[in-house]
């Protein structure tokens, strides 16, 4: 699916043209949508679809005329119990004129911008949009980590009584989620570090405070994840 937005008179508006100041939002895009965006913006189709590959690693690369940024964002595993998540790539492509986001699924990280739930958001402020996406992703990790911790505590209360195989399986799934999160958050932190040092990407002084906030939130999410992994260690022998 492809939707195109542009901030006009401080309002987010759906538009049809891929012109300056627009945000092209691709969710599980069709081949035709990929070809159309690639041809219009002179972008390699492989760079557009990269983020739809669940195995794609977080990275940043400077291409001829555009920049590719890929980060990992959390998403709930379909059909799984509460607190069981995985991560999927979110692609962000920056050209001189506009920004493109690509993801294999609908997520709140992107959806909150389309629903106008993010203050100070403008499609015309590309780097600020990137930082806002990373900030939203970091805070979502923290939100999901709190859910994981609550679910872990609820399960471990049962360990003093009858131990069920389903409880052990769920604890293992929660632990796997924490490992996914730790790996993805570290990769995102590396991308952010590189992002701040690329001179090609225009940075504005007003965005510095937001950038600092993103760095703090990612670090906090990493610390929360590592702390929960450590807390889970005493019950790990029960799942072997």
Write out the residue ranges for each language-model feature.
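Peripheral, non-transmembrane regulatory/ligand-interaction domains of membrane transport proteins
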Residues: 1-206, 210-213, 217-224
């Amino acid at each position: 699916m492809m939707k195109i937005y542009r901030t006009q008179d401080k309002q987010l508006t759906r538009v049809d043209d891929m012109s300056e100041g627009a945000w092209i939002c691709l969710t599980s895009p069709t081949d035709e949508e990929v070809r159309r965006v690639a041809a219009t913006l002179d972008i390699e189709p492989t760079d557009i679809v990269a983020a739809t590959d669940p195995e794609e690693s977080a990275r940043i690369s400077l291409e001829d005329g555009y920049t590719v940024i890929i980060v990992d964002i959390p998403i709930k595993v379909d059909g799984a119990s509460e607190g069981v998540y995985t991560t999927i790539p979110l692609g962000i492509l920056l050209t001189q004129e506009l920004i493109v986001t690509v993801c294999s699924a609908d997520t709140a990280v992107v959806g909150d911008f389309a629903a106008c739930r993010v203050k100070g958001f403008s499609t015309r402020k590309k780097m600020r949009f990137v930082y806002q996406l990373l900030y939203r992703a970091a805070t979502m990790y923290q939100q999901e980590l709190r859910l994981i911790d609550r679910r872990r505590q609820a399960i471990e209360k049962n360990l003093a009584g009858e131990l069920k195989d389903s409880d052990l399986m769920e604890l293992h799934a929660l632990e796997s989620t924490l490992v996914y999160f730790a790996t993805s958050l570290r990769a995102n932190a590396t991308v952010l570090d590189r992002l701040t040092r690329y001179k090609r990407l225009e940075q504005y002084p007003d965005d510095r405070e937001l950038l600092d906030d993103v760095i703090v939130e990612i670090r906090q999410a990493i610390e929360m994840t590592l702390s929960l992994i450590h807390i889970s260690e005493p019950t790990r022998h029960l799942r072997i």
